């Protein structure tokens, strides 16, 4: 999944710090390695009042009518901490989340996200506080992200975020690290075949 250079979407606030991967998707749902079908289990223990019958909790923001179509998640610091399960990223994407905005992310979650084209935007805590307050006060839930200039546009103001050229290229083109490497296969093969035989058993075929 790739994101266009300029993307506008609705934003859902989740005003909680240290959301770990078990909260994102509990371990009992990690029984397959395909990337689809996990969206219904996203935030399972918060999202449902009856977990067996999947009865929605009306007080949880993702279940409120004004946020049900949201594709951008706004949350607090240290999002994605805990175990390294990639299923957490799959659940977010399968639900429809394309972008997460926070003041910080777990390192492993950060890597897993970009390998699956889930865009993570890091802003300072003051800006995150401002966004939460604006949403609460004005009931605003639309935001624009410019991936070319690295700006978030919200309430007629823009906020810079850092994104490496490599991650930008992967997000815009729907690539992971392996896809990117394969784009340079011919150069890798040529270099490998130039290595003296005493360094390798066989040349790259």
From Swiss-Prot:
GO terms for biological process: L-leucine biosynthetic process. InterPro entries: 3-IsopropMal_deHydase_ssu, Aconitase/3IPM_dehydase_swvl, AconitaseA/IPMdHydase_ssu_swvl, LeuD. Keywords: Amino-acid biosynthesis, Branched-chain amino acid biosynthesis, Leucine biosynthesis, Lyase, Plasmid. It comes from the Bacteria. Pfam families: Aconitase_C (PF00694). It is an enzyme of class 4 (lyase). GO terms for molecular function: 3-isopropylmalate dehydratase activity. It catalyses: (2R,3S)-3-isopropylmalate = (2S)-2-isopropylmalate. Pathway: Amino-acid biosynthesis; L-leucine biosynthesis; L-leucine from 3-methyl-2-oxobutanoate: step 2/4. Its EC number is 4.2.1.33. Transmembrane segments: none annotated. Catalyzes the isomerization between 2-isopropylmalate and 3-isopropylmalate, via the formation of 2-isopropylmaleate. Belongs to the LeuD family. LeuD type 1 subfamily. NCBIfam families: leuD, PRK01641.1. Heterodimer of LeuC and LeuD. This is 3-isopropylmalate dehydratase small subunit. It comes from Buchnera aphidicola subsp. Thelaxes suberi. The gene is leuD.
């Amino acid at each position: 999944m790739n994101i266009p250079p300029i993307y506008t979407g609705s934003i859902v606030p989740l005003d909680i710090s240290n959301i770990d991967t078990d909260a994102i998707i509990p371990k009992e749902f990690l029984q397959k390695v395909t990337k689809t079908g996990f969206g219904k289990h996203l935030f399972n223990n918060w999202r449902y009042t009856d977990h067996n019958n999947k009865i929605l909790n009306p007080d949880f923001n993702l279940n409120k009518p004004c946020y049900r179509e949201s594709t951008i998640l706004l949350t607090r610091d240290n999002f994605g901490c805990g175990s390294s399960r990639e299923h957490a990223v799959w659940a977010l994407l399968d639900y429809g989340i394309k972008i997460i905005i926070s003041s910080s992310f777990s390192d492993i979650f950060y890597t897993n996200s970009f390998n699956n084209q889930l865009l993570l935007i890091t802003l300072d805590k003051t800006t995150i506080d401002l966004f939460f307050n604006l949403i609460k006060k004005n009931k605003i839930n639309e935001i624009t992200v410019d991936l070319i200039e690295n700006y978030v546009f919200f309430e007629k103001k823009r906020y810079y975020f850092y994104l490496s050229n490599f991650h930008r290229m992967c997000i815009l083109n729907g690539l992971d690290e392996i896809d990117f490497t394969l784009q340079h296969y011919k150069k890798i093969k040529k270099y490998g075949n130039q290595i003296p035989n005493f360094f390798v058993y066989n040349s790259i075929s």
